Amino acid sequence: MDRSGLVTGVKQGTCQISKKDMTYQVDVRHLEQRENGTYVDGILIVNKSYPLSADYDPGLQPETKAAFQELCDAAAAEGMDIYDGSDYRDYSYQVKIYHNYCSLYGWEKADTFSARPGYSEHQSGLTIDCNTIDDAFGETQEAAWLAEHCADYGFIIRFPKGKEAITGYKYEPWHIRYVGADVAKEIQKYGLTLEEYLGVDSVYAEPWQ
């Protein structure tokens, strides 16, 4: 258990943790390393601790695309204009994006809002940036609708406000990740990040070289 209370298991099963006079029952999740990346209980995790292979090139996943279309249709029915501003990016494209930000802001600042090559969720084909990549989007009715309803279509707000120390990235109200409706609703219900739900961290092993 770390200082924030995050518990990481080393094998599948359950464990019991006691703190002072309080006892908690904790599920231990199953972490599996596959050829393209790391899965926790069957969910692909991509963050600063868990990269994808450079040659992983799935494009936008069909299930993600279909679910997003349903989301957009539902939003439109309520007078909202939500659209795909950016989705899949391959490794080489992320190299260009990250290096450009590093040249403009330095790698320490870039790391707060841009993923290093191989560490971007966009390469998974499970992530979509809605509308415009602009902090002002967070003040729109579309952003409010997205935060309230995206879980119904299997998406989560991947980098929520106030969770920067956990996700490793600044708040991005436009950035949604497909995890399936059951998981998304549970994450939304308890106000979790994907890291908290899966019991993993998001920290680069070393400074950018």
Language model feature labels by segment:
Residues M1-L31:
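Extracytoplasmic soluble-region selector
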Residues M22-Q209:
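Extracytoplasmic cell-surface/polysaccharide-interacting catalytic and binding patches
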